[in-house]
From Swiss-Prot:
Transmembrane segments: none annotated. Disulfide bonds: none annotated. This is Small ribosomal subunit protein uS19. It comes from Polaromonas sp. (strain JS666 / ATCC BAA-500). SUPFAM superfamilies: Ribosomal protein S19. One of its GO terms (biological process) is translation. Protein S19 forms a complex with S13 that binds strongly to the 16S ribosomal RNA.
Length: 92
């Protein structure tokens, strides 16, 4: 179920404050955040946000096509190592 339009997008207030500070200071350092639930706003375009995936912070460069998505969509939490190979016994 999607979020009601009358409520607007959810973004943690500390993330917006850090983004505004980075834009005014023209700071290129990644903004560290644990807020995977925050929606990407148009003000974030051009910033690099380091999103926590449970183990480390994954740097995500924000482009215009990402607006409206959640930050957690771009920092994967699980790594797929492939299915194990079949170990069939060969009779001689």
């Amino acid at each position: 179920m999607t979020r009601s339009l009358k409520k607007g997008p959810f973004v943690d207030h500390h993330l917006v404050a850090k983004a505004d500070k980075a834009v005014t200071n023209k700071d290129k350092k990644p903004i560290k955040t644990w807020s995977r639930r925050s929606m990407i706003l148009p003000e974030f375009i051009g910033l690099t946000i380091a999103v926590h995936n449970g183990k480390q912070h994954v740097p995500v460069y924000i482009t215009d096509q990402m607006v409206g998505h959640k930050l957690g969509e771009f920092a994967l939490t699980r790594t797929f190592k492939g299915h194990p190979a079949d170990k069939k016994v060969v009779k001689k």
